[in-house]
Swiss-Prot record:
<dbReference type="Pfam" id="PF05250">
    <property type="entry name" value="UPF0193"/>
</dbReference>
<comment type="similarity">
    <text>Belongs to the UPF0193 (EVG1) family.</text>
</comment>
<dbReference type="InterPro" id="IPR007914">
    <property type="entry name" value="UPF0193"/>
</dbReference>
<protein>
    <recommendedName>
        <fullName>UPF0193 protein EVG1 homolog</fullName>
    </recommendedName>
</protein>
Length: 216
């Protein structure tokens, strides 16, 4: 029974001791630590020290001297000590409760009430359903906007008079700038065309007036 409780002293070709199953370290963790120690090229003393710590179930040391002779001489420079890889150091990743409370981890989400329905409007809607059997939404009365009377259309005869006057003023301005010869023929042709249109309007209106007088 005693031989079964003991762990095999040495693994072939490695010099690593097998660790007992402790509460703090699972067999998978022990195997991972063996591999990491091998890759980190730790001395035999450092490996034995770490394995003994694991068998006791104690936390792994943050640093380990390469030999036992340096254990009793802490006054020497810290450069002689070999620091363990970060994965071999056991650090708790749990945050303290005070830090969680400061970050609001324990604070409850405030209740935000949703928009309530208009009870009076719902009451009127139900009354309308009971009275008429139909669900009709109340329509807001849109104020009637009075439309302004459109501006009276400018008489075509008056438009022609204004257009002729504008062309006369333009031609006078060009004459003052010494460019009247360039625009004179164009402006006079347009004025002549508009005068003929005015004569046509005058004859048509005179004819309509005579017809109206004849029927009375």
């Amino acid at each position: 029974m005693a031989s079964q409780e003991r762990v095999d002293s040495v693994t072939k070709g490695t010099g690593f001791r097998r660790c007992r199953k402790q509460a703090g370290y699972t067999p998978g963790t022990c195997e991972l630590l063996r591999v990491m120690m091998k890759e980190s090229k730790l001395t035999n003393f450092q490996q034995r020290h770490i394995m003994d710590t694991m068998k006791r179930g104690a936390p792994l040391p943050l640093q380990c001297n390469p030999t036992s002779s340096l254990r009793g001489s802490p006054s020497k420079k810290a450069a002689s000590a070999i620091y363990l890889p970060p994965i071999l150091a056991t650090h708790s990743h749990l945050r303290p409760a005070s830090l969680c409370q400061a970050n609001g981890a324990y604070s409850r989400e405030q209740f935000k009430p949703q928009a309530t329905r208009d009870l009076e409007k719902e009451k009127r809607r139900l009354q309308n359903i009971f009275a008429t059997g139909k669900d009709k939404e109340e329509r807001k009365k849109v104020p009637h906007v009075r439309q302004e009377d459109p501006a009276p259309e400018l008489d075509r005869f008056d438009e022609l008079v204004k257009e002729i006057q504008d062309r006369k003023e333009f031609l006078a301005a060009m004459e003052a700038l010494g460019q009247g010869r360039q625009y004179r023929s164009i402006i006079l042709a347009e004025i002549s065309q508009k005068l003929r249109e005015m004569e046509d309007i005058d004859r048509r209106r005179s004819k309509e007036l005579r017809k109206a007088l004849a029927t009375t």
